[in-house]
């Protein structure tokens, strides 16, 4: 009987040629910008390292990373927290190197955020159970930080877009904060009137705003919330975890105007003082973002650039409304060429929005 043929490749045999990569669309639309191929080259990648400090309230110079002691009101109508009791979003804009010498070309380069490595800094500081914290036993260690915690970060080519949702629409927030305007009972659920852009650090209370899932096409955000009275904080430390920022088309956030935006909130729980009062405890977050150059179709024609340059030189006035739903403009007339003097001055002839000549009497 003939020996059976040995299965598998023979030693020393040439390796099989790998399959060709799957073809994907090269041209996609992203936020109104037509994305072309990725520019190759050694200098096409860059890394940005930064960190964001927490904005818990910082009630005094000795309590950075903590909020002011919290106090729960008995009545919904009496709720009026201080600014120092409200943890707020941390945000920063990172200016990137200018990579376009000529903005009048048909194609330009934009920075594209590809990956991010991030972690919370200072986790081991919460092992301090001997500094001003309430004792768990008469002669024991202090009570560890515990309670509701929220960890969130975002990386984008534009500021994070927010949706407002309130737990109590009757709460009176301090003037130094940005909260949903004209709050009603509908503000305690989805109300599309409450939209905002995270454009200021330490101004948007976390309890009032969440990332808007219907927007943020040019931003990637990640977050987890764990609620409860005695919930311990669970945090991981590693420099090997990488979060990919590309979408299903293989495109990451495109940094408009050479600007990269990072946002974060890291509320680890409640610190219990010796007196029994409690404060929110927050920690800073580290970012390491990798960017590459992406060739895109120039979305800014030369006429737009010139118009923008001229408009920037115009004095801005915060005056009464002359456009929009509340416009105070009554009528606009445009005259062209000349005609014989009409015998009836009340007879008005004009071209309507459909291009038709119309005559009407006053």
Swiss-Prot record:
Keywords: Capsid protein, Caveolin-mediated endocytosis of virus by host, Disulfide bond, Host endoplasmic reticulum, Host nucleus, Host-virus interaction, Late protein, Phosphoprotein, T=7 icosahedral capsid protein, Viral attachment to host cell, Viral penetration into host cytoplasm, Virion, Virus endocytosis by host, Virus entry into host cell
Region (C-terminal arm): 302-362
InterPro entries assigned to the protein according to its UniProt record, in alphabetical order: Capsid_VP1_Polyomavir, dsDNA_vir_gr_I_capsid, Polyomavir_VP1_sf
Protein localization: Virion; Host nucleus; Host endoplasmic reticulum
Record-level Gene Ontology MF annotations: identical protein binding; molecular adaptor activity; structural molecule activity
Phenotype when changing residue 255 to S: Complete loss of infectivity ex vivo
Record's function text: Forms an icosahedral capsid with a T=7 symmetry and a 40 nm diameter. The capsid is composed of 72 pentamers linked to each other by disulfide bonds and associated with VP2 or VP3 proteins. Binds to N-glycolylneuraminic analog of the ganglioside GM1 on the cell surface to provide virion attachment to target cell. Once attached, the virion is internalized by caveolin-mediated endocytosis and traffics to the endoplasmic reticulum. Inside the endoplasmic reticulum, the protein folding machinery isomerizes VP1 interpentamer disulfide bonds, thereby triggering initial uncoating.
Protein name: Major capsid protein VP1
Native source species: Simian virus 40 (SV40)
């Amino acid at each position: 009987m003939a020996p059976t043929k040995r299965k598998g490749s023979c030693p020393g045999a040439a390796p099989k040629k790998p399959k060709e990569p799957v073809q994907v669309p090269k041209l996609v639309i992203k936020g109104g910008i037509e994305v072309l191929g990725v520019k190759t080259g050694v200098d096409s990648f860059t890394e940005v390292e930064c960190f964001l400090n927490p904005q818990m309230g910082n009630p005094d110079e000795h309590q950075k990373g903590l909020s002011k002691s919290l106090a729960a009101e008995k009545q919904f109508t009496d709720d009026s927290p201080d600014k120092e009791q409200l943890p707020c979003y941390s945000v920063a804009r990172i200016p990137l190197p200018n990579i376009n010498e000529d903005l009048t070309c048909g194609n330009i380069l934009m920075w594209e955020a590809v990956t991010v490595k991030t972690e919370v800094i200072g986790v081991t500081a919460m092992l301090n159970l001997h500094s001003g914290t309430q004792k768990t036993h008469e002669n024991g260690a202090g009570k560890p930080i515990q309670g509701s915690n929220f960890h969130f970060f975002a990386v984008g080519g534009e500021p994070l877009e927010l949706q407002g949702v309130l737990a109590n629409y009757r709460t009176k927030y301090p003037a130094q904060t940005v909260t949903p305007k004209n709050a009603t009972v509908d503000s305690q659920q989805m109300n599309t009137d409450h939209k905002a852009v995270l454009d200021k650090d330490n101004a948007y209370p976390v309890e009032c705003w969440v990332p808007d899932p219907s927007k943020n096409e040019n931003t990637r955000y990640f977050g987890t919330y764990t609620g409860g009275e005695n919930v311990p904080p669970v945090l991981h430390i590693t420099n090997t975890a990488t979060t990919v920022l590309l979408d299903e088309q293989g495109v990451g956030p495109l940094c408009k105007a050479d600007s990269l935006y990072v946002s974060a909130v890291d509320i680890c729980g409640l610190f219990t003082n010796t007196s029994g009062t409690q404060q929110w405890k927050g920690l800073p977050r580290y970012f390491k973002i990798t960017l590459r150059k992406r060739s895109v179709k120039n979305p800014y024609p030369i006429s737009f650039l010139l118009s923008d340059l001229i408009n920037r030189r115009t004095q801005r006035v915060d005056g009464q409304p002359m456009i929009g739903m509340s416009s105070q403009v009554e009528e606009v007339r445009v005259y062209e060429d000349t005609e014989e003097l009409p015998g009836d001055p009340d007879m008005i002839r004009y071209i309507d929005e459909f291009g038709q000549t119309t005559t009407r009497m006053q």
